[in-house]
């Protein structure tokens, strides 16, 4: 996987099985990691796709964690996003999605997460902890999947309603700075200045990073409403449009542009953390 934002089709419509396999081969894996015991029941991600289709949801994104050289890529964590067949073009520039996260190496349970997709910036949004459910890898647990799916789908309108409330709230500069500082702190240690003599080695965000997080990439993102500001910050933090500072063991300070998040697990963690910053 090169980058999560490239794990969708260019037109953001439904994906074919061949397109899914090209981006996330673990979705169609038939085996589990050899280290796992018989108590671990493999829940094949591909088996969930027809169930999602029965509820009108089609796959629109497939992403997979990169594996180390000796690890089997068919067992690593992966993500599928699903959207309603009649809502692939969205309304108001945003469509709701159901995200399915799974692995076959024992590193995670099956997770269903409420989410959304914003077309103008191709941002995938993952709702916070109160909007997701888990399914453990045990025998017969797949029978509970539909109950979890219905529970997740019921939460989707609340996500879109929250966005509407955010659009009605205007933020002043101090509020924007506070939100951006909280956001960058989800990825990097935040300090007012890295030029302290006793600063430990590491990657740090500072006031310049806040400015980068708030920066606008397109005219559609110009605005002071909560939703627009939050989306600017989310895009910049997830995609690495933020300059940070690296402090070496010799206390040298080097400025570097951050990288996009390529880990599926980290993408979900930071994305959920950003969602949890929303207070209306």
Language-model features and meaning:
Residues 1-43, 54, 71, 274-280:
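Intrinsically disordered, low-complexity regulatory segments
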Residues 1-8, 86-95, 103-280:
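Intrinsically disordered, low-complexity regions enriched in serine/threonine
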Residues 42-111, 267-269, 273-277:
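Amphipathic, interaction-prone secondary-structure segments
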């Amino acid at each position: 996987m090169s980058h999560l934002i490239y794990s969708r089709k260019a037109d953001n419509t439904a994906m074919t099985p061949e397109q899914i396999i090209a981006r996330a081969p673990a979705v169609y894996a038939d085996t589990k990691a050899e280290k796992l015991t018989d108590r671990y029941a493999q829940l094949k991600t591909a088996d969930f796709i027809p169930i999602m289709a029965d509820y009108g949801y089609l796959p629109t994104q497939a992403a997979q964690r990169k594996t180390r050289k000796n690890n089997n890529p068919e067992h690593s964590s992966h993500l599928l996003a699903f959207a309603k067949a009649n809502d692939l073009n969205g309304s108001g520039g945003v469509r709701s999605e159901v995200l399915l996260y799974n692995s076959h190496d024992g590193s995670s349970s099956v997770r269903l997460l409420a989410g959304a997709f914003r077309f103008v910036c191709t941002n995938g949004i993952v709702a916070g902890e109160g909007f997701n459910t888990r399914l453990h890898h045990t025998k017969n647990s797949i029978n509970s999947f539909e109950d979890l799916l219905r529970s997740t789908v019921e939460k989707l309108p609340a996500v879109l309603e929250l966005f509407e409330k955010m659009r009605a709230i205007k933020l002043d500069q101090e509020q924007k700075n506070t939100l951006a500082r909280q956001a960058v702190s989800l990825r990097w240690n935040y300090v007012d200045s890295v030029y302290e003599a006793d600063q430990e080695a590491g990657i740090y965000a500072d006031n310049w990073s806040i400015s980068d997080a708030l920066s606008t990439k397109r005219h559609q993102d110009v605005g002071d409403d909560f939703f627009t500001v939050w989306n600017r910050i989310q895009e910049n933090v997830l995609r690495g449009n933020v300059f940070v500072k690296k402090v070496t063991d010799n206390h040298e300070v080097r400025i570097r542009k951050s990288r996009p998040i390529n880990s599926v697990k980290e993408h979900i963690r930071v994305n959920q953390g950003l969602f949890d910053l929303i207070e209306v």
